Amino acid sequence: MKPEIHPDYHTIKVVMTDGTEYFTRSTYGAEGDTLNLDIDSKSHPAWTGGTQQILDRGGRVSRFQKKFSGFLKK
C-alpha cells in the first residue's frame, strides 16, 4: 500500500437504538468518538419484518414525500 493516502483507522464506540454499545474500528470521526445510530438491525423494518414508519430525522422523508407525492399518478 502507498503510505500517507489512507484515512486514519481507529477505535470508536457505536450506540444502537436500544442503548446497546460496542466498540469497533472505523475511519469515522476520531479515536474515541461515539456514533449514535438512528436505525439499526434491531429497529429497521427490513430486518424486523414490521411495517413501522422510519423516524424522520430532519424532515428529509417528509420533503421527499411532499415533492414526489403525485409522481406517476394519473
Swiss-Prot record:
Signal peptide: none
SUPFAM superfamilies: L28p-like
Pfam families: Ribosomal_L31
Keyword RNA-binding among record annotations: yes
Transmembrane stretches, start-end: none
An individual GO BP term: translation
Keywords assigned: Ribonucleoprotein, Ribosomal protein, RNA-binding, rRNA-binding
One Gene Ontology cellular component annotation held by this UniProt entry: ribosome
GO molecular function per UniProt: rRNA binding; structural constituent of ribosome
PANTHER family: 50S RIBOSOMAL PROTEIN L31, CHLOROPLASTIC, LARGE RIBOSOMAL SUBUNIT PROTEIN BL31A
Known partners and oligomeric status: Part of the 50S ribosomal subunit.
Protein family (similarity comment): Belongs to the bacterial ribosomal protein bL31 family. Type A subfamily.
Function as written in the Swiss-Prot or TrEMBL entry: Binds the 23S rRNA.
Designated name of the protein: Large ribosomal subunit protein bL31
Originating organism: Afipia carboxidovorans (strain ATCC 49405 / DSM 1227 / KCTC 32145 / OM5) (Oligotropha carboxidovorans)
